[in-house]
Amino acid sequence: MANIKSAKKRAVQSEKRRKHNASSRSMMRTFIKKVYAAIATGDKEVAQKAFNDMQPIVDRQASKGLIHKNKAARHKSNLVARINAMQ
């Protein structure tokens, strides 16, 4: 553990941010998994609704720097392609 007061504070702040980021990342992954699950059921309307719920969350995490913007774009592109391929 740190001895200097400012280093102790930084350690506390870092741990707080780590927990918050982990929570946000987990939430985002859950929304992505819901889209994959909806695609697996074969219902295009449900999959589209799940995607519409997921998209702003992924974009928000990318704008905050939690994930890279290209990763967000890759997730969205992959899922849209799968949804459009459904009948």
Swiss-Prot record:
Residues 1-22 have a biased composition (Basic residues). The keyword Magnesium does not apply. InterPro entries: Ribosomal_bS20, Ribosomal_bS20_sf. Keywords: Ribonucleoprotein, Ribosomal protein, RNA-binding, rRNA-binding. GO terms for molecular function: small ribosomal subunit rRNA binding; structural constituent of ribosome. Belongs to the bacterial ribosomal protein bS20 family. Binds directly to 16S ribosomal RNA. This is Small ribosomal subunit protein bS20. It comes from Pectobacterium atrosepticum (strain SCRI 1043 / ATCC BAA-672) (Erwinia carotovora subsp. atroseptica).
